[in-house]
Amino acid sequence: MPQMAPISWLLLFIVFSITFILFCSINYYSYMPTSPKSNELKNINLNSMNWKW
């Protein structure tokens, strides 16, 4: 059974590492959080001042 040279393992590691880093960075920068609507913010602010004691 033929064995791989160490440079091939290094090349595989580099290729998979670059692929993983690119995948993670694309996922990180493609995430766009949705901002809450102004009506929801007003309701939250009004309800937070409703003391029950």
From Swiss-Prot:
The chain crosses the membrane at residues 4-24. The keyword Transport applies. GO terms for molecular function: proton transmembrane transporter activity. It is a single-pass membrane protein. Pfam families: ATP-synt_8 (PF00895). Keywords: ATP synthesis, CF(0), Hydrogen ion transport, Ion transport, Membrane, Mitochondrion, Transmembrane, Transmembrane helix, Transport. Signal peptide: none annotated. GO terms for biological process: proton motive force-driven ATP synthesis. InterPro entries: ATP8_metazoa (IPR001421). Its main location: mitochondrion. It is found in: Mitochondrion membrane. GO terms for cellular component: mitochondrial membrane; proton-transporting ATP synthase complex. F-type ATPases have 2 components, CF(1) - the catalytic core - and CF(0) - the membrane proton channel. Belongs to the ATPase protein 8 family. Mitochondrial membrane ATP synthase (F(1)F(0) ATP synthase or Complex V) produces ATP from ADP in the presence of a proton gradient across the membrane which is generated by electron transport complexes of the respiratory chain. F-type ATPases consist of two structural domains, F(1) - containing the extramembraneous catalytic core and F(0) - containing the membrane proton channel, linked together by a central stalk and a peripheral stalk. During catalysis, ATP synthesis in the catalytic domain of F(1) is coupled via a rotary mechanism of the central stalk subunits to proton translocation. This is ATP synthase protein 8. It comes from Drosophila yakuba (Fruit fly). The lineage of its organism: Eukaryota, Metazoa, Ecdysozoa, Arthropoda, Hexapoda. The gene is mt:ATPase8.
